Amino acid sequence: MAMLRTDLEFSMLPKLDSRPVRWRIADGLVAYEEAVVAMEREVAAIAEGGDELVWLVEHPPLYTAGTSANAGDLVQPDRFPVFATGRGGEYTYHGPGQRVAYVMLDLKRRRQDVRAFVAALEEVVIRTLDMMNVRGERREDRVGVWVRRPEKPMLADGTMAEDKIAALGIRLRKWVTFHGLSLNVDPNLDHFSGIVPCGISAYGVTSLVDLGLPVMMADVDIRLRAAFETVFGETVNEP
C-alpha cells in the first residue's frame, strides 16, 4: 500500500557536492509563452549539469490546461487566453497578484521520488503560510494546499468548508522538474469563475488578502524563500 503524502519524508536536500539553487524574481508580468520557452531552455541546461533554478513570476490573466483537463471544466473559454501545457493536473488560473514559482530541480541530485517531490512542494507552501499564522493543509485526494473556512456554511456532506490557496502542477524531463506551484496572494478571485479549478467544484479558492492579511508580494517572497531552503536547501541570488 502506498504511503500517504502526509507520511512521506519532506526533505529533498541535495547531495553534498551540489551547488546552491539559483533564485530569480521576474520584474513585471511575464507572458506565459515566454515563460514556457525559458523553462524549456533552463531544463535542458540543468539536465546537462547546469545549476538548478527557482523562478518567481506573475502572469497576465490566463488559464492553463494540464494533461488531465476536462474540456467541460473550461466554463468561459473566451474570457482569457487558454494554454495547453504538459504539466500534470487540470485547469488552473494565473494572473496578477498570484505568485507562480517555477521550480526546476534535478531529482537525480536529490531523491528520485515524484510523490515525495509533490509533498515537498506542498510543504514549502504550508511552511510559508505558517510564517504568516495561516494554517495550510494537504489533502490526500486533492493535490495542493487548503485552508479551512469555519465562517462559511458547511458543505452538503456536513464537513467544514475549505478553500484552495495554492495549486501544484509539475512535469519531469530526464528527472528535471519544471512548472511548479502558484500561491494566491491577492489575485482577482472572480477570475477563477471561468473554470472549475483543478476539476474540483465542491470547494472554493481563497488568497492571503481574502483571509485578512494585507501582505505585499515581496513579503511573501521572503517567506517563500526561507521555507524553500528548509526543504530543498541553499539558494543564491541570480547575478
Swiss-Prot record:
A Gene Ontology term for the protein's cellular component: cytoplasm
Biological processes annotated in GO: protein modification process
Lowers pKa of active site Cys, annotated site positions: 164
EC class of the enzyme, as a word: transferase
Designated name of the protein: Octanoyltransferase
Protein residues bound to substrate: 87-94, 167-169, 180-182
Pathway assignment: Protein modification; protein lipoylation via endogenous pathway; protein N(6)-(lipoyl)lysine from octanoyl-[acyl-carrier-protein]: step 1/2
Anything else known: In the reaction, the free carboxyl group of octanoic acid is attached via an amide linkage to the epsilon-amino group of a specific lysine residue of lipoyl domains of lipoate-dependent enzymes.
PANTHER family: LIPOYLTRANSFERASE 2, MITOCHONDRIAL-RELATED, OCTANOYLTRANSFERASE
PROSITE patterns membership: BPL_LPL_CATALYTIC (PS51733), LIPB (PS01313)
Gene symbol of the encoding locus: lipB
Predominant place of localization: cytoplasm
InterPro entries assigned: aa-tRNA-synth_II/BPL/LPL, BPL_LPL_catalytic, Octanoyltransferase, Octanoyltransferase_CS
Compartments, as annotated in UniProt: Cytoplasm
MF (Gene Ontology): lipoyl(octanoyl) transferase activity
Coiled-coil stretches: none
Function recorded in the entry: Catalyzes the transfer of endogenously produced octanoic acid from octanoyl-acyl-carrier-protein onto the lipoyl domains of lipoate-dependent enzymes. Lipoyl-ACP can also act as a substrate although octanoyl-ACP is likely to be the physiological substrate.
Keyword Acyltransferase applies: yes
Transmembrane domains' residue ranges: none
Residues forming the catalytic site: 198 (acyl-thioester intermediate)
Keywords: Acyltransferase, Cytoplasm, Transferase
Reactions catalysed, as given in the entry: octanoyl-[ACP] + L-lysyl-[protein] = N(6)-octanoyl-L-lysyl-[protein] + holo-[ACP] + H(+)
